[in-house]
């Protein structure tokens, strides 16, 4: 079998195509979640914490070079200048992104699993008692009631 034919067979399998579609949709979905966190959740968190902007929270670890022209209070300016900074604010934002994404995926999987479950039918009525059992019960009852 030629290598091209093997690759074509591999690439056109359902699992590979499903994975490709999942990656593309996941990338688009990640953009949506990032926007939700950045534009909707973090402003509310900032408002609740008195205007705290997490994206600019950091601890400077290295010295500022003499040629530095930016603001020493700006995380991005310090990073651009090559100063070592511990950007815990960015980490908090990424962590919130991850938690929201994980929760939404959990809800989606739960929803899909519920769709896959067969509808739980109401308990079926017991089958009618067979005639031979009814006859045996009659015989038993008549023997109980007959004098000995």
Curated annotation (Swiss-Prot):
Keywords: Cell inner membrane, Cell membrane, Ion channel, Ion transport, Membrane, Transmembrane, Transmembrane helix, Transport
Membrane-spanning parts: 16-36, 89-109
This protein's name: Large-conductance mechanosensitive channel
Family to which the UniProt record says this protein belongs: Belongs to the MscL family.
PANTHER family, alphabetized: LARGE-CONDUCTANCE MECHANOSENSITIVE CHANNEL, MECHANOSENSITIVE CHANNEL MSCL
MF (Gene Ontology): mechanosensitive monoatomic ion channel activity
Pfam family, one: MscL
Role according to the record: Channel that opens in response to stretch forces in the membrane lipid bilayer. May participate in the regulation of osmotic pressure changes within the cell.
Oligomer and partners: Homopentamer.
Keyword Metal-binding (UniProt): no
Predominant cellular place of this UniProt entry's protein: membrane
GO cellular-component term (any): plasma membrane
Membrane-protein topology: Multi-pass membrane protein
Domain of life according to the entry: Bacteria
Cellular localisation: Cell inner membrane
Species annotation: Paraburkholderia xenovorans (strain LB400)
